[in-house]
Each structure stands twice: as structure tokens, then as C-alpha cells.
Amino acid sequence: MVSGSKAGVSPHREIEVMRQSIDDHLAGLLPETDSQDIVSLAMREGVMAPGKRIRPLLMLLAARDLRYQGSMPTLLDLACAVELTHTASLMLDDMPCMDNAELRRGQPTTHKKFGESVAILASVGLLSKAFGLIAATGDLPGERRAQAVNELSTAVGVQGLVLGQFRDLNDAALDRTPDAILSTNHLKTGILFSAMLQIVAIASASSPSTRETLHAFALDFGQAFQLLDDLRDDHPETGKDRNKDAGKSTLVNRLGADAARQKLREHIDSADKHLTFACPQGGAIRQFMHLWFGHHLADWSPVMKIA
């Protein structure tokens, strides 16, 4: 069972403790291996590189707000399955045939360090591990496990991350409308946020209306998250290649930074309203969301170390 917030513990400290529990669980899922097992080594290094862990953190916070009654190991398995999926998608996104990135999470990308073939195989290995984790979750009835697997597979597939990356590769240089950009942003970013919250809702036996409202929240949160990422494209502390959006039709490039920041705030306000209905008795996600975006929107300050 997920406990509530502890009295006297700052939100920042609590997030750090939760993130450490996620990192520890990930390390256990991908133990250190013989240096000759290059694919397993690439999987572990890709996952264990310093990351924000936003997705698994949100899952733990959502479990608190939704009054999840299962075990913490099961919840961590579900959360880490999503993080493995996210990391696999980053490995593929960074490939020379796609974004051709050299830096990720402050370190050389997987294909730069291990080669392209290893990066592809490592991403497949991570996806396999992710689905296996959910399928083997002992605390959940079989029907719920199947629903959770379906949520994640749909988010990853040809109507999810795959389509989003295809559009980003082929349409980003075009003069896209704002709606077209928003659609691609949802597929690239928002759809995995939606899937992970649905997985927590399934594990928490939440009502259909709650799940529907969480989906609406994820739509707005994902758009805000992508806008923040685009606004920080040239920021030196992202741990990624800088100015990768030059020449692309992002909302920031199309509307300007000030208008994009205003659009971001509108998405946060809308997401907050959805949370009021989805989690009326819990405020863990809401507090995290406002802390996270508030600090970054204020002055791009790196002071908030949950970044």
C-alpha cells in the first residue's frame, strides 16, 4: 500500500526518496553483468543514466491519490515497466536514421557508445522486459494485467509512439498548423503519460469516469511537458544536444516563446481542473505538477533537483 505524505518532510525531499526507490528497483531489474554481454550492459547503462524519472514518479503519486491498495513492489514493477519503455523509445529516437543525437541524459547516446546494432537490440530488450514485468505482476488479477499490457502496447504501437516519431521525422520541416503540431506532440509524449496513468488506475480499480478524467489530464500534461521541452531546446542543462529543433515547426518556433509559455500555462490550468475531478481527495500529483512547472517557467532554474 502506498502511504500518504509524511508530516514535516518537504515535497522536494519526498520526491528524492521516491526517485531513489525507483532507481533502486530499476537497478535490481537490470543487474550488473559481464562486460562481454554488451546488449545487457547497454540496456543497464541506458536506463541507469541520470534521468528525471517523471513517468514512474507520476505513477507513484497517482497511486497515492487513487488510494491504491496493492503492494509497493507491484507498483514499482508497473512504474519501472513504463520507464523501461520510455528509455527504449529514447534509444531509437537518438539513432542516426532518426534524430541523430549524440548526447542523452548528460552522457553519449547508446548508439554512440555501443554502436547502432547494439542500440537497436537493447531497445528491443527493454521493451520485452517492460511487457514481461506487467504480465508477471502477481498482485493483479489476470484481467487487469491484460488491460495494463494492452494500454502500454497501444501507446507504443503504430497509433502511438511509432506514429508520433514517424510524423516528427517526416512532417516537422513542413509548415504545419498548430493543431497538427499538437497532434504529433500527443503521440510523441502525451500518449505514454495517458497509458501510465491508466495502468495505475487499472491497478487501483478506479471507476471508468475517473479513468476518463485522468486521460484528459494526461492530454494537457503531455502538451505542457512537450512545450517545456521545446522551450528548453537551447538550454545548456538539459543533458541533450542543443538546438535540435532549429528548422522544425514546433509551437515555440511558430508562435514564439512568450506565446508558447502562455499556452503551456493554459494546459497546466486545464490539467489542474481535471485532477480536481479525478482525485478530489488527493493532491500529490497536483503539488508535483505545480512545483515542477513553476520552477522551470520562473527562470529555467536548475534549483529543483527533481528535474
UniProtKB/Swiss-Prot annotation:
Residues noted as binding (2E,6E)-farnesyl diphosphate in the record, renumbered to the chain: 104, 188-189, 226
Catalytic activity: isopentenyl diphosphate + (2E,6E)-farnesyl diphosphate = (2E,6E,10E)-geranylgeranyl diphosphate + diphosphate
Gene Ontology biological-process entries: carotenoid biosynthetic process; geranylgeranyl diphosphate biosynthetic process
GO molecular function: geranylgeranyl diphosphate synthase activity; metal ion binding
Cofactor binding mode and count: Binds 2 Mg(2+) ions per subunit.
Record has Disulfide bond as a keyword: no
A Pfam family recorded for this sequence: polyprenyl_synt
Binding annotation for isopentenyl diphosphate: 52, 55, 86, 105
Residues binding Mg(2+) 2: 93, 99
UniProt: Mg(2+) 1 binding residues: 93, 99
Cross-referenced InterPro entries: Isoprenoid_synthase_dom_sf (IPR008949), Polyprenyl_synt (IPR000092), Polyprenyl_synt_CS (IPR033749)
The organism's place on the tree of life at top rank: Bacteria
Enzyme class: transferase
Required cofactor names: Mg(2+)
Gene3D superfamilies: Farnesyl Diphosphate Synthase (1.10.600.10)
General function of this protein: Catalyzes the condensation of farnesyl diphosphate (FPP) and isopentenyl diphosphate (IPP) to yield geranylgeranyl diphosphate (GGPP) needed for biosynthesis of carotenoids and diterpenes.
Record-given protein name: Geranylgeranyl diphosphate synthase
Organism: Pseudescherichia vulneris
Lineage per the UniProt record: Bacteria, Pseudomonadati, Pseudomonadota, Gammaproteobacteria, Enterobacterales
